[in-house]
């Protein structure tokens, strides 16, 4: 049976890791062993932050809606309660976009919410 030498596969694996770790600081981009550790950690951060990103954007939308609603003398929680009573089915992403881009349209939504709360 012939002897199996793994130089080609090892080189390919090292090359793949070093290519993926390009742009890392210091030896993290040039030394295979350190690059492998940094690359694994970077993938962990990426996995975690794909989930955190969703939370962060939701928090941003809520802050934008809250700021816009307070200009009309209302709080965020009261506004969301009024939306449900008025049966306006818009998510926070859309509401934040309207509040940010089109103040007049958002003012109309607030009027409908105030009407639903008064009733």
Swiss-Prot record:
Q: Which residues cross the membrane?
A: none
Q: State a single Gene Ontology molecular function.
A: rRNA binding
**Gene3D superfamilies found in the cross-reference section:** 6.10.160.10, Ribosomal protein L20
The record's InterPro entries line, in alphabetical order, gives:
Ribosomal_bL20, RIBOSOMAL_L20_CS, Ribosomal_protein_bL20_C
Q: Which GO terms describe its biological process?
A: ribosomal large subunit assembly; translation
Query: GO cellular component terms?
Result: ribonucleoprotein complex; ribosome
The UniProt entry, under Pfam families, shows:
Ribosomal_L20
Keyword tags:
Ribonucleoprotein, Ribosomal protein, RNA-binding, rRNA-binding
Keyword Glycosyltransferase included in the entry's annotation: no
Q: Which domain of life is it from?
A: Bacteria
Q: Which family does it belong to?
A: Belongs to the bacterial ribosomal protein bL20 family.
Tell me, what does this protein do in biology?
Answer: Binds directly to 23S ribosomal RNA and is necessary for the in vitro assembly process of the 50S ribosomal subunit. It is not involved in the protein synthesizing functions of that subunit.
Q: What is this protein called?
A: Large ribosomal subunit protein bL20
Q: Organism source for this protein?
A: Granulibacter bethesdensis (strain ATCC BAA-1260 / CGDNIH1)
Q: Which gene encodes it?
A: rplT
